[in-house]
Amino acid sequence: MNTIFFDNNSTTKIDPDVFTFYKELTKNNNRNWFEHQKERFKKLELGVKKFAENIKLGLDTADDIEKVKLFRIYRDVRFSKDKTPYKTHFGIAFHRKKPELRGGYYIHISPNNNFIASGFWDPSPSDLLRIRKELEIDAQELIDIIDVSQFKKKWGHL
């Protein structure tokens, strides 16, 4: 496994105002409030874009990342009972080079629910079959991961 190092500079940090902004947005999730905060949001969004690009540079030392996607703040409310117009988090996806590589990475930034995820989101039936076949042939790497005490402490025994 490769270790990724980042420079200790401002583009590897999230501006604390991101969390303040989203706390305020959660309480004021309406177009009028957002319009008055749009310039502030654009500045914060630019900082998160720089953060994401810096993370991509680090990931590129260990993987082949094709693109970075910063998700829009606007929610699609057409088929939702919840009509609040704005997401209350930043979502960043790092897509691996296709078709050679599958899967990717995701960073979720919000006041009380930050997380990093990696893996394969919504695999096609043929990809899912391949994953199952690979585990059937040799599951040792997965067993080694889920057998670590920290994993068991967090997720229990599988």
Features from the language model and the residues they span:
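Short, hydrophobic/aromatic alpha-helical segments in well-folded domains
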Residues: T20-F21, Q37-R40, A93, A117, ...
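Short, intrinsically disordered, low-complexity segments enriched in Ser/Thr and Pro
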Residues: K56-Y74, I131-E134, A139-I145
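Hydrophobic/aromatic-rich structural module bridging two neighboring secondary-structure elements via a short loop
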Residues: D60-R102
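Compact, glycine/acidic-enriched structural inserts
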Residues: N112-L158
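Pyridoxal 5′-phosphate
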Residues: M1-T11
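Contiguous, amphipathic alpha-helical segments that mediate oligomerization or scaffolding
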Residues: D17-A62
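Acidic, low-complexity proline/glycine-rich segments
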Residues: T11-D17
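Short, hydrophobic/aromatic-rich beta-strand segments within well-structured domains
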Residues: G91-H95, G104-I109, F115-G119
